[in-house]
Design a protein with these regions (language model features):
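Loop/turn-to-beta-strand initiation segments
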Residues: 1, 22-26, 148, 185-188
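Walker B catalytic acidic pair
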Residues: 5-6
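Post-DEXD/H (motif II) to motif III coupling segment of the RecA-like Helicase ATP-binding lobe
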Residues: 9-70
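Catalytic P-loop NTPase motifs of RecA-like helicase/translocase cores
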Residues: 9-11, 34-35, 198, 216, ...
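Interdomain linker/hinge connecting the two RecA-like lobes of the SF2 helicase core
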Residues: 50-149, 153-157
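A conserved SF2-helicase RecA2
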Residues: 54-66, 217-223, 228-277
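Conserved helicase ATPase core of P-loop NTP-dependent helicases/translocases
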Residues: 148-153, 157-199, 218-219
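A short beta-strand element within the Helicase C-terminal
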Residues: 188-192, 196-213, 218-221, 234-240
Length: 277
């Protein structure tokens, strides 16, 4: 028997080995590929199609994984004109997050051709990912945390700004920082994508996801980093969401497979929990 852990990462380059293997193939994944026609979808369908499903909530109910709760923080876009925008001549002018969001959304809504819709959608997402108000909120959030916490940032520069210790491909101290975080000598670490899967951090009880992307797979993988505790413990995942923006739809999409009773929505303006996003 061959066990393919994280089988959603299968590539066509693995075909020669799999074709020549005469035994049973068992694939294991928490996020099977869903995009039909993609390389990874084809590989999973060919060599280890889904035969049995066991959800995260079934695993927590059966004490295989520790329990969890998700707190969605409903943030407002900033109206302060401190967002630098570059002109064609290389100089800068300043807008606010609110004004910039109105502009990129207007461009998206006015786009007619599919390629233009796709382009303006990506540009809107990139704009939202660069807004600094989430960074300020994260810093205030982790300042009040006494346990080990990982922050999933949007960019390498953002990860470096948020925590004193970061983990990403251009940081030469990444492996050292991960070691310090794993053994408990530091309790805060920011990263981008590389800790989304395949890395287990002992005693990791808290995580912050700055941007959900509307991607259920990425969100599941990141929350999965918090499900390695003793089954009697509970992990907390914080997800930041800009209120009254497309960010709400992205977060809802990313969390659609999770137990709704374990999700709470916090409004920091009134310091109260609300019923829905």
């Amino acid at each position: 028997i061959v066990y393919l852990d994280e089988c959603h990462s299968l590539l066509e380059s693995h075909t020669p080995f799999l074709d020549n293997f005469n035994g049973n193939i068992v694939g294991l994944t928490g996020t099977p590929p869903k995009r039909k026609g993609s390389e990874k979808y084809r590989m999973v369908q060919k060599y280890c199609p889904v035969k049995y499903e066991f959800s995260v909530d079934e695993a927590t109910d059966n004490k295989i994984l520790n329990d969890y709760k998700i707190i969605v923080h409903k943030l407002e876009l900033s109206g302060v004109r401190n967002l630098p925008k570059k002109k064609k001549d290389g100089t800068y002018w300043y807008s606010s997050e609110k004004k910039d969001y109105e502009y990129v959304t207007k461009r998206f809504l006015e786009a007619v051709k599919p390629k233009d819709r796709q382009f303006t959608s990506i540009m809107r997402m990139r704009s939202i990912m660069e807004y600094r108000s989430k960074e300020s909120y994260v810093k205030s959030l982790i300042a009040n945390m006494n346990s080990k916490c990982i922050v999933f940032a949007n960019t390498q520069a953002q990860a470096d700004r948020i925590c004193s210790h970061s983990y990403h491909s251009t940081n030469n101290n990444s492996n050292r920082n991960l070691e310090l975080f794993s053994d408990g000598r530091i309790d805060k670490l920011s990263c981008v994508l590389q800790l989304s899967e395949g890395v287990t951090i002992p005693g990791l009880k808290s995580g912050i996801i700055m941007h959900a992307y509307g991607n259920e797979r990425k969100t599941s993988q990141r929350i999965g980093r918090l499900l390695r505790l003793n089954p009697v413990e509970t992990a907390v995942c914080h997800i930041l969401c800009y209120n009254n923006t497309v960010d709400k739809a992205w977060v809802s999409q990313a969390l659609k497979s999770f137990d709704k009773s374990k999700i709470k929505y916090y409004n920091p303006l009134i310091r109260q929990y609300e019923l829905e996003i």
